[in-house]
């Protein structure tokens, strides 16, 4: 039975009990304790991005997933991933009915019931009730629905406060991105006003949706950035079809952290939300916060390069991975100004035009394959002997020595610069 059908079955043919939540509580923690007292089971309350807002303290029974959530103040990422895969979270985002969640031993999750808290058509958060010492009855499930309604107003107030904080942080982030704030002391002061410490190591990442960035997609991106535990996401803002985030690594391997986060984001956008046409890039990793603007410009440069050389750079995410592509714009401008002419490349291009051949592409793939004829022949889908013959003809036509690294690299660079003008 699907999670959605379970929810329908749970909420059917039940008479609403008296409301035990008609009296208001000042603190969300008190609400969690009261729900726990009424239902006689441990309770946790989370926001829509699975950050812990409150938990009941009256019960000693728990499970490893709940313990980790309380210690880390958020649901562990491995638990979130499992709940997506088993259909629990997708179901919670579609219905306001309670949903039973079966035990998942590998992430330390015992049986529980979950319910989402709604305001109109928007999910504000979730209540989780552990079924360790008892199984919730039909009447308990109705009580849980009343609890969700009682918690709604508390979460609305938190959301309003969060929105105001986000507006302040977005304005500050934009000033750094555009260079309007560039002094390190001013930046550190800005972080302090937001209740944060300036990062000791960081990079700017851009997630570009190649299409319209709708409000729904923006919420999905925000969900991914707030639930990740691969990097720290310090600041975020949206510009047109791009989500721009200031990230800080979590381990002593910052490049690995950032690349893994980029790969994970790309994968989850595809698997969870069916969003495939997306480009992700991050700039240099710096220790001084005064380089935020530079890291941002480098991330933009990566996206520009990925557009121009889509096939060659499809597995690249970072500015440091671009290699010679970092310098193509500068070289192209310099060579245009100097009226540069590559004799060998021009000879090959003329030969291709006259004979409807592809000698330039053959040479390009050969060099990209690190001059390995076996690898290059597979890329070109031709026999090794055919490739060897072509390489011999290329040497004759272009009058170059393909064993000379300098000559090979020069003509390869000019081939790439030619692509920029197409």
Curated annotation (Swiss-Prot):
GO terms for molecular function: DNA binding; DNA-binding transcription factor activity; GTP binding. It comes from the Bacteria. Transmembrane segments: none annotated. Disruption phenotype: Disruption of adeR causes a sporulation defect. GO terms for biological process: DNA-templated transcription; positive regulation of DNA-templated transcription; sporulation; sporulation resulting in formation of a cellular spore. This is DNA-binding transcriptional activator AdeR. Belongs to the CdaR family. Keywords: Activator, DNA-binding, Sporulation, Transcription, Transcription regulation. Gene3D superfamilies: 3.30.450.40, PucR C-terminal helix-turn-helix domain. Pfam families: CodY (PF06018), GGDEF_2 (PF17853), HTH_30 (PF13556). PANTHER family: CARBOHYDRATE DIACID REGULATOR, DNA-BINDING TRANSCRIPTIONAL ACTIVATOR ADER. Activates ald expression in response to alanine availability and is important for normal sporulation in B.subtilis.
């Amino acid at each position: 039975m699907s999670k959605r059908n379970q929810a329908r079955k749970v909420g059917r043919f039940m008479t609403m009990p008296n409301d035990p939540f008609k009296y208001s509580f000042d603190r969300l923690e008190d609400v969690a304790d009261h729900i726990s007292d009424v239902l006689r089971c441990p309770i946790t309350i989370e926001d829509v991005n699975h950050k812990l807002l409150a938990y009941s303290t009256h019960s000693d029974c728990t499970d490893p997933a709940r313990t980790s959530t309380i210690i880390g103040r958020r649901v562990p990422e491995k638990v979130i991933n499992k709940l997506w895969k088993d259909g629990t979270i997708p179901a919670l985002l579609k219905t306001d009915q309670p949903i039973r969640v079966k035990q998942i031993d590998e992430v330390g999750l015992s049986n529980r019931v979950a319910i989402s808290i709604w305001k109109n058509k928007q999910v504000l958060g979730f209540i989780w009730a552990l079924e360790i010492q008892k199984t919730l009855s039909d009447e308990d499930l109705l009580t849980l629905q009343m609890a969700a309604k009682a918690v709604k107003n508390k979460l609305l107030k938190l959301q309003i406060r969060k929105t105001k904080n986000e507006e302040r942080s977005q304005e500050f982030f934009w000033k750094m991105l555009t260079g309007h704030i560039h002094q390190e002391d001013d930046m550190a002061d800005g972080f302090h006003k937001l209740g944060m410490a300036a990062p000791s190591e960081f990079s700017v990442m851009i997630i570009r949706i190649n299409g319209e960035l709708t409000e729904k997609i923006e919420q999905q991106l925000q969900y991914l950035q707030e639930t990740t535990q691969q990097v720290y996401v310090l600041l975020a803002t949206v510009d047109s079809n791009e989500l721009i985030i200031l990230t800080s690594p979590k381990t002593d391997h910052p490049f690995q952290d950032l690349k893994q986060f980029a790969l994970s984001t790309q994968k989850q956008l595809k698997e969870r939300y069916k969003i495939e046409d997306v480009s992700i890039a991050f700039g240099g990793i710096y220790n001084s916060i005064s380089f935020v603007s530079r890291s941002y410009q480098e991330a933009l440069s990566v996206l520009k390069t990925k557009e121009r050389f889509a096939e060659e750079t499809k597995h690249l995410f970072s500015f440091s991975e671009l290699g010679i592509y970092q310098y193509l714009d500068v070289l192209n401008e310099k060579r245009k100004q100097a009226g540069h002419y590559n004799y060998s490349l021009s000879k090959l291009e003329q030969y291709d035009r006259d004979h409807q051949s592809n000698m330039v592409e053959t040479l390009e793939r050969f060099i990209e394959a690190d001059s390995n004829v076996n690898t290059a022949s597979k890329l070109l889908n031709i026999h090794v002997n055919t490739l060897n013959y072509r390489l011999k003809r290329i040497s004759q036509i272009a009058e170059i020595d393909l064993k000379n690294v300098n000559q090979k690299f020069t003509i390869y660079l000019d081939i790439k610069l030619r692509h920029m003008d197409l």
